[in-house]
Amino acid sequence: MTPADLATLIKQTAVEVLTSRDLDASMLPEQIVVERPRNPEHGDYATNVALQVAKKVGVTPRDLGTWLAEALAADDSIDSAEIAGPGFINIRLAAAAQGEIVAKILEQGEKFGTSDHLSHLDVNLEFVSANPTGPIHLGGTRWAAVGDSLGRVLEAAGAKVTREYYFNDHGRQIDRFALSLLAAAKGEPTPEDGYGGEYIREIAEAIVAKHPDALDRTPEETQELFRSEGVEMMFSHIRESLHEFGTDFDVYFHENSLFESGAVDRAVQKLKDNGNLYESDGAWWLRSTDFGDDKDRVVIKSDGDAAYIAGDIAYVQDKFERGHNLNIYMLGADHHGYIARLKAAAAALGYAPEGVEVLIGQMVNLLRDGTAVRMSKRAGTVVTLDDLVEAIGIDAARYSLIRSSVDSSLDIDLGLWESQSSDNPVYYVQYGHARLCSIARKAADLGVTYEDADLSLLTHDREGDLIRTLGEFPAVIRAAADLREPHRIARYAEELAGTFHRFYDSCQILPKADEEKAPIHAARLALAAATRQTLANALALVGVSAPEKM
């Protein structure tokens, strides 16, 4: 019985108790909260539902709690239910009910923890979206890991997810990129406000090798060649780096297409037609303050050119027109102003502003021996995705970026993540999975199986701790999806690995060489198998491998 199963039982029991006393069962909350008590001696789980409801139905919390506890204790899946304090109910599960969690995991396998909780959502998840003017830096690398994991978590909760990369190929930064490449090809210094680094020289040389006449064309033709070829080569490298990192996208959306297709003009005309765009001083302004923004925004400048926000507005409209009812933008720390701006754009276009969510990620710092690592071999002044992967590997890189909330800045200690010790979180979790696989191999050699295991034998305290931790996994996925916080999965994996290691140290799983096979061995092997499956499921959600040997 998982906490969710227990919550359902409590809800059903509470309805029966209230109805039998002519009390209003509609006062019960939609979701019954079930938690593990801080003191394990108080029971397996606790609920405060009596405190929540008693006053609403005109009885004391102690009375309602007593009635509920008596009714719950009569259920075969409950070993005991006791009233505590002003109206808390402490619950102990029967051994057979605890074992049901293990059986459910073994039956559901890779599906354990998933649900249809968010099946009503069609999500457009846009992340990374780095300009094609250089390799992905650490901030973009954080989004590559977190965004990919969030997509997996949302899908596990039942949502339909489209992963999207907004390819910024329209604007002055692309011109500066082209001029930087051209200068490198000519052997000239990097232009002011240009891009430097070894990668600029490499791309410039590749363009000249592909087009030997590149520098012999007219200035306009030469700049356009370096612009188009440079962007294509840079973005090809970005896509390859992301793919090797385990992050792929369903859609690569070109910003330029918004202008070439007329999408910007259509969005502007729609805003004019519905009165949410007005003219002042020769420019056209969005009435964004009517929709929660701190100021109105210029959409079409007085010279007739579109302001940057015009593309943002057209992009919002395009996403909704494609059928997405939740559009998540994952942006850097310098984009706080975009939250109100994008929601205002959606509302002005006639869409639900809650259909736009903006997640803001904070900075990432790389440290070695307490000193910041600031230089990249190829990129010059910034550390890149490739640098991080080269230093600590893909699994450690992804895990180090995912396990902390994006709301806070992140320091990555390279020495810690390189180490093969329990201090390294990803090593600790992966070692737990490898140890569980080793147990399975040894069990096969000994002829121990768990097909007919009596799971009611799992009564040791450490067994109970492990079973309860396993039972929390579905709720962890649900919370991670609802709150858009995939770091909860990584932290859960660490908790599960730690709980397993303590179980392993306290409970002999397999018979020793001179021992006969016993029912407890089969039961503990089943528990180990369920733990391995759940740990593998958690690692899959953060995009980290689950090694069978280490």
UniProtKB/Swiss-Prot annotation:
Its EC number is 6.1.1.19. GO terms for molecular function: arginine-tRNA ligase activity; ATP binding. PROSITE patterns: AA_TRNA_LIGASE_I. GO terms for biological process: arginyl-tRNA aminoacylation. InterPro entries: aa-tRNA-synth_I_CS, Arg-tRNA-ligase, Arg-tRNA-synth_N, Arg-tRNA-synth_N_sf, ArgRS_core, DALR_anticod-bd, Rossmann-like_a/b/a_fold, tRNAsynth_Ia_anticodon-bd. A motif ('HIGH' region) lies at residues 130-140. It comes from the Bacteria. This is Arginine--tRNA ligase. It comes from Corynebacterium efficiens (strain DSM 44549 / YS-314 / AJ 12310 / JCM 11189 / NBRC 100395). The lineage of its organism: Bacteria, Bacillati, Actinomycetota, Actinomycetes, Mycobacteriales.
